[in-house]
């Protein structure tokens, strides 16, 4: 951000809004066509969880760039502690309760991360889309990010789609 600390939080907010719209749209399409046999509550919780986890991904990248590794670890410890606690508390509501506990815990994790970013980079402005300007777009970072994430997820896809290691749960 070229030493302009005041532009970090508005850019983060803009990116988060953009990401929520994109992941929300993708989630609605998937929810509509692929989980029709599940309850409406289950589908809404899956949508909320997908959007919140996508937000967490962005917040983690921001905090990593700020070299706030201990804060990231503490945020995840609190968030996942809440996830387990809420899931245990809501388990009488079956799958929807467990999923609701997961989403609540992830939301707490996200809020904690956003507070850390806000505390480190306060701003007078709420939102900006400077990251979308052509001069701020770097294709090399797009490809590095794509292949890094592809590598992280490749083994998961292999396990999910290789029949001997996967089985339908729902």
Regions found by a protein language model. Name each.
Residues 101-122, 129-170:
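Transmembrane helical elements of multi-pass membrane transporters/channels
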Residues 17-25, 36-59:
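Alpha-helical transmembrane segments of multi-pass membrane proteins
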Residues 16-20, 47-51, 73, 77-81, ...:
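Residue-level signature of the transmembrane alpha-helical core
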Residues 1-33:
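Membrane-water interface segments that mark the loop-to-transmembrane alpha-helix transition
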Residues 4, 54-74:
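Membrane-interface junctions at transmembrane-helix termini in multi-pass inner-membrane proteins
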Residues 75-119:
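Hydrophobic alpha-helical transmembrane segments
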Residues 2-10, 68, 163-169:
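Juxtamembrane helix-boundary/capping and inter-helix hinge elements in multi-pass membrane proteins
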Residues 29-37, 85-92:
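Juxtamembrane "helix-exit" motif on the non-cytosolic side of transmembrane helices
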